Amino acid sequence: MVVIDHHRRMVNGIEPTIMSFLEPNASSACELVTALIEYFGEDSNITVHAAEALLAGIMLDTKNFIMKTGVSTFEAAAFLKKKGADTIAVKKLFANSIETYHQKSSLINSAHLYKECAVAYTEESFSEIRIAASQAADELLGITGVKASFVIYETNGVINISARSMGACNVQIVMESLGGGGHLTMAATQLNCSMNEARKRLADAIDEYWENNSQE
C-alpha cells in the first residue's frame, strides 16, 4: 500500500505501507501526485483526463489557488496544463444544479455576524446540502471583516457544522472544542442535539476561542 497525503501523520496512521509520501506544506495530495509523475519524467505519460482530474483536485483544495498555494503548486498546475489539462473542462466539473445554487444562496442570506464570524444555518434538508453548505461557508469569507464562517445544517437527524477561515481564526480549535477537527482553515463537527442547541454551543465555542486568542 502507498500513502500520499498532505495531512500530518496521525498516531493511528495507515499501516503497513511500502511507501509513505507525506508533506503537510503541500497544497493537496494531487499536487504531490503530480510532483511524483513529473519526477519520473517522460516515461510517466498521463492521459488528458488524468491531468484534468489532478488539476481539479488542486483547485478544489486551494480554493482556486488562494489557500496554501506555493510556487510548487503553480509548477504542478503548469505541468498538468502541458499534459493537456483544459481549465474550462475542469471548471465544468464543479458546476452545480440549480437546486444546489438556490440552497447555497438561501444559506448565505441566513447569515449573521457574530464576533467577526459569519454564521449561517438551515433546518431544511436536501440531497446536496453538504455541497451547498461547504460552498456557502467559502463564499461567506468574502464579507468584509469576517475572519471565519460557520454553516450549520442537518443530515439524517445529526447536526453538522462546516467551518472555514483565511487563517486569522483557527477553525480547527473551534471545531475541536465541539468534538470535531480539521485544519487551520477548514474544519467540521457533528452534534447530536437540536438546531437551537447547536447554535448556542457554537456561539459558546466562538466566545471561548476569542477569549483565549487575542483579536487583531
Show which residues each predicted segment covers.
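Hydrophobic/aromatic beta-strand patches that form the interior of the parallel beta-sheet core
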Residues: 2-4, 19-22, 118, 150-152
